[in-house]
Structure formats: structure tokens, C-alpha cells
Amino acid sequence: MRAKPSDAKLTGLFLDMLAAEQGAGPNTLDAYRRDLTDFSEFLGRVGHSFADAETQTLRDYLADLDTRGFKSTSVARRLSAMRHLYRFLLNERIRGDDPAAILSGPKRGRGLPKVLSIADVDRMLRRARELSEAEDASPSKRLRALRLYCLLEVLYATGLRVSELVALPRTAAKRDARMIVVRGKGNKERLVPLNEASRQAMADYLAATEAAKSDKKTGVAASKWLFPSFGESGHLTRQHFARDLKELAVASGLQARLVSPHVLRHAFASHLLHNGADLRIVQTLLGHTDISTTQIYTHVVEERLKSLVRDLHPLAEK
């Protein structure tokens, strides 16, 4: 009798398929790996594995997540990982059934994203610019301030995912570039326009990095990345940028918990829609494959339409 493949082996095969056939990126693969590792550890505790777990065991795992205090969004994500895994195992004939097919997830309403006001974003931009222009700052401190200001300007101008932003190549800062090519989820490319402020911020930051290369005290070396670092990836990490952004929020008089790279991406989309942008255009700029993902912002469009009717309809005052 042939031995059952281990959970680790099946996880590896599944992740290889996601990378090869669906173009899943490192962040997506890491998320699946974490979720499936947790699921595997639960199965091990109850004497099962991916290869022999039944539907009731999967239900027990979902109940365990609830007992451990996981939010409904996190439970739904784990369930999605399980469904994808067992569909793969069925297609590969590793299993003859799909125990996750009839599972139902937690009911959850999709919450509206937190949105910073235009005034809040402007406060952060002004503070970041002030820090980048501080004359008494050391060369290394000024370079970090210029980097943060550049990151903020580009993020609010483009609405990039944070993973796309920190991994921009150095070539994105070409002189007079009006558009940048962004490699997004599934390795798909899209063109995103830059405004004058973001282009200038990139030019100033790039000039500072060029000057810093000759200064050994700054530790700046040649790199293909626009925002290089000495870490394994070679570029600034999402976590580092998020931490810097929260510090900037506090320095701008805002609550750190209300600010993140993702919140600024939401601000980009919401502010565009509030000012009349078409939902399909915003979908393209955000890199959403499905319009339903972008439709979370329709509350902004609805409020604007109500305002237009209230302010412009000839009988609105009667």
C-alpha cells in the first residue's frame, strides 16, 4: 500500500501550481503557506492529514478558529485556502473527493475601507516635505526623509499596492516620465500615470541617492531598485514603509492607527471617485481584475450623485 503524501509535500505541490499556472506572487504564496501550515497543525493534533480529512474535520477546524478569536474575515480566508487546496488535490487525483466543497463560511458584510480626508493627506504630504527639506538634518537622515516623501507622493498619485510601490525599479524614475509600468498581481503589467508632484519627488530623491553613493557614511550602493535596502529582497520592505508612515502620521497630528499604505490606496480611489472619475478607470488604475472588487467604493459615487441632485436639480429647493 502506497504511503500517503505528507501535508508539507502537498503544500509544496499546491504552491508550485499557483506560481506556475496562476502567476501567484511571493506575498500570495506566503499567505497560503501560513494558512495551510496552521490547518495542517490542527489536523495533526486530531490525528488526520490533508489526504484523509473529512468534511466534519474541516468544520471542526473552522470552529477552532472561531474559538481562538479569529475574525470572520480571517476565517473566510482560511476556508478559501482549504477550498483551493482540495480542488487541486481532486484535480490531481490525489484525492477522490472534495471535503471542502459543501462547507459554508462565516457570514460577513464587506466593510467600507477607512478613508483619510484630502486635508489629512495634505497634512502628511506637507509634513513629509518639510522633513525632507530640513537643513539641519544629517545626510543619511535627509535621504530617509526624501525617500518617505517620495513614497508618499507616488502612493497618493498612483494608488499602487504597497508591494508594487516598494518594488519599483530604478527605471521608474526616468526623466520626464509621464507613466510608469507596474507589475502587479499575477505578474500582470499596467500603465499608471504620474502627476507633476510625484515626478518631482522622484527626481529629487534620485538625485540625492546619486550624490549619496560617493558618501560612504550613508551606506548607499548601486541598486536596480528605486527604494533599495540591505535586506534579502534588495528593496525596502512593506513593514518598514508602514512603520515610517505611522511615525509621519503622528508627526502630522493624526492617529497612527488610522494610517497605513492600504488606507492611502483607498484614499486615492475614493478621492478620484468623489471628484467625478469613472469607476472603470479607477478599476484599471488600481489593477483590479474584477469590477466587483472596485465596487466597494460605490458608496462614494452614490453620495456624489445625491449631492449633484440636491445641488443642481431645478426642483430640489421646492
Swiss-Prot record:
Record PROSITE patterns: CB, TYR_RECOMBINASE
Catalytic residues? 161, 185, 262, 265, 288, 297
One of the GO biological process terms: cell division
Location in the cell reads: Cytoplasm
Q: Which UniProt keywords apply?
A: Cell cycle, Cell division, Chromosome partition, Cytoplasm, DNA integration, DNA recombination, DNA-binding
Superkingdom of source:
Bacteria
Any one Gene Ontology MF annotation carried by this entry is: tyrosine-based site-specific recombinase activity
Core-binding (CB) domain location is 5-90
Which Gene Ontology cellular component terms are annotated? cytoplasm; Holliday junction resolvase complex
Q: Which InterPro entries match?
A: CB (IPR044068), DNA_brk_join_enz (IPR011010), Integrase-like_cat_sf (IPR013762), Integrase_catalytic (IPR002104), Integrase_recombinase_N (IPR010998), Integrase_SAM-like_N (IPR004107), Recomb_XerD (IPR011932), Tyrosine_recombinase_XerC/XerD (IPR023009)
Asked whether the keyword Lipid biosynthesis is assigned, the reply is: no
| Main localization of the protein described in the UniProt heading | cytoplasm
Residue stretches making up the Tyr recombinase domain: 111-310
- UniProt similarity note: Belongs to the 'phage' integrase family. XerD subfamily.
Q: What interactions and quaternary structure are annotated?
A: Forms a cyclic heterotetrameric complex composed of two molecules of XerC and two molecules of XerD.
Q: What does this protein do?
A: Site-specific tyrosine recombinase, which acts by catalyzing the cutting and rejoining of the recombining DNA molecules. The XerC-XerD complex is essential to convert dimers of the bacterial chromosome into monomers to permit their segregation at cell division. It also contributes to the segregational stability of plasmids.
Query: What is the protein name for this chain?
Result: Tyrosine recombinase XerD
Task: Identify the species of origin.
Answer: Bradyrhizobium diazoefficiens (strain JCM 10833 / BCRC 13528 / IAM 13628 / NBRC 14792 / USDA 110)
